[in-house]
Amino acid sequence: MEPLTIGYIALPVALFLLAMRVPIAAALGVVASVGIFVIFAWRPGADFQPEYAWQPTFSLLINSPFAFITSYTLSTVPLFIFMGHISYEAGFTTDIYRAARLWLSKLKGGVAMASIVGCGGFSAITGSSVACAAAMGRIAIPEMLKFGYSKPLATGSVAIGGTLGSLIPPSVLFILYGIFAEQSIAKLFIAAIIPGLLSLFAYIVVIYIWVSLKPDAAPVPEETVTRADRMSALGRCWAIVLLFVVVIGGIYAGFFTPTEAAGIGAAASLVLGLVLGRLKTSNIGSALKETVYQSSMIFAIAIGGKLFVNFIALTGMAASITALIDGSGASVVVVIGLMVVMYLSLIHI
């Protein structure tokens, strides 16, 4: 059996496993491992010979993930996640949410809109959608329910706001994409700023339309908020603004690389929290524990993805698909449209 045939068989199997809710790391890793073994065992012009496949398969399965995980650039992932969790433990996330809530307090759906803004602010210092949704969920959902917001609106606004963590820099997703695609992470970060802000604004517009159609879903809180309260809350957001400017501004200005920026951001958030008296030993321990949990999950998925990329390279599928697209004569717009459809299909999976 030709490697290309093995690849075209394995791809739908991987998609089927994902559709069956098999963990991503397991689905990609298992399919890639079996596929690599079969390719090495099925030599051209010979029968299936598994005795020749064990050594090269295990060599690839061990060396490739090790080389990937020990990558210097990949260290940005736990560092940015740690920066986000330290900022949450220090209350910086609460500061930006409270400021947004007070400034939007008189609008219908203002608390839900504030959760979106809070997610955007938190995304700017963590880059993890999971950390963003979890942190903002603990802060915003209880408050929205207290004010009489409907549960679908309360939970939905935090869930969709959490996706900003995958778009607004420093996005972990862009870091992994940059490593896999061998692209500049700094350029990816800069390119994501405007789409991230547009997405944030679009989510707010959707909430406004929702509460306009269903006013009972978001009662306006009966509270008195003065201009002094708003300005005071806004002034307390300086820590998050400083961290974002140092990290993203430093990358954009060329002062340091994304990896160096992650280290500086993590150290700066820790120092700020300690100097301001907002962190205790238990807070740091909690941040470290959450960082280990989330980094382990992300690394497991990344290892599965790396093995699958190696498998695809062995099959020659990339060259085959490229030749197919070139030979079809399809325009760039059609190709991009097909890619969008594919991505949307994967989201539903």
Where are these regions (language model features)?
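Alpha-helical transmembrane segments of multi-pass membrane transport proteins
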Residues: 1-349
